[in-house]
Amino acid sequence: MKIAAIIPSRYGSTRFAGKPLAPIAGIPMIQRVYDQVKQAICVTDIAVATDDRRIVEAVTRFGGNALMTSAACRSGTDRAAEAAKQMGLAPEDIVVNIQGDQPLIAPQTIDETLAPLLSDPDLGMTTAAFAIMDKQEITNPKDVKMVFDADGFALYFSRSPIPFARDKDTRFDTFKHLGIYAYTRRFLDIFTQLPNGVLEEIEKLEQLRALEHSHRIKTVVTRYDSPEVDIPEDIPRIEAMMASMAAD
């Protein structure tokens, strides 16, 4: 069985054009992500999926594998599905979809997210969550929050703070959704054929499509955060975190 990590990467961004090639401590962000993914123990294949030749050339320069996909892909998941088809993955193979703007994605998180699919072949999709430590992230709509049931299956994802504590002295963890998914190739093909959901369109969160169509998403809680780069101003923060990690 193959376990393919696919990193969807788009050059055009309204908030940060050319983001995948932006240097982080002198190295393109897409290379930072790729290098983190290479350290995951369970991953057998890696590919960057893009619709831009500049990204293909950058990945090729550092010795990585890049696939050209259609500019018509609606989302990173659609791009990952197209790449999985190009790679000839079998229905039982596993695809890990890792957003290309997470230069600090922990290899351990990748392996942890995969684990439920390896132990339970009936699962179709998994993801990861992190208990928020920076309270500003709870109210920031770019940080997606999630709740899950007692068995670890996702109940909802939202840009709003969830759950809401009616009693202000209630103590609980708020979980941030991390930008990583793992699916069987079979389920990935099913997912991309589903019509968009109402909640998905309201929140602009494609993972809600699975829940709205009664598919379950197993959630793994990791102790490793994975901050994203959304705008140029995020890069100094990431570089500072890298420097702090190197000093420890």
Curated annotation (Swiss-Prot):
Main location: cytoplasm
Annotated GO MF terms: 3-deoxy-manno-octulosonate cytidylyltransferase activity
Pathway the protein contributes to: Nucleotide-sugar biosynthesis; CMP-3-deoxy-D-manno-octulosonate biosynthesis; CMP-3-deoxy-D-manno-octulosonate from 3-deoxy-D-manno-octulosonate and CTP: step 1/1; Bacterial outer membrane biogenesis; lipopolysaccharide biosynthesis
Domain of life: Bacteria
GO cellular component terms attached to this protein's record: cytosol
Listed Pfam families: CTP_transf_3
Keywords, comma-separated and alphabetical: Cytoplasm, Lipopolysaccharide biosynthesis, Nucleotidyltransferase, Transferase
InterPro entries assigned to the protein according to its UniProt record, in alphabetical order: Cytidylyl_trans, KdsB, Nucleotide-diphossugar_trans
Coiled-coil features, chain-numbered ranges: none
EC number annotated for this UniProt entry: 2.7.7.38
Catalytic activity field: 3-deoxy-alpha-D-manno-oct-2-ulosonate + CTP = CMP-3-deoxy-beta-D-manno-octulosonate + diphosphate
GO biological process, one term: CMP-keto-3-deoxy-D-manno-octulosonic acid biosynthetic process
Presence of the UniProt keyword Transferase in the record: yes
Protein localization: Cytoplasm
SS bonds (residue pairs): none
Task of the protein: Activates KDO (a required 8-carbon sugar) for incorporation into bacterial lipopolysaccharide in Gram-negative bacteria.
Family of this protein: Belongs to the KdsB family.
Name of the protein described by the UniProt record: 3-deoxy-manno-octulosonate cytidylyltransferase
Organism of provenance: Desulfosudis oleivorans (strain DSM 6200 / JCM 39069 / Hxd3)
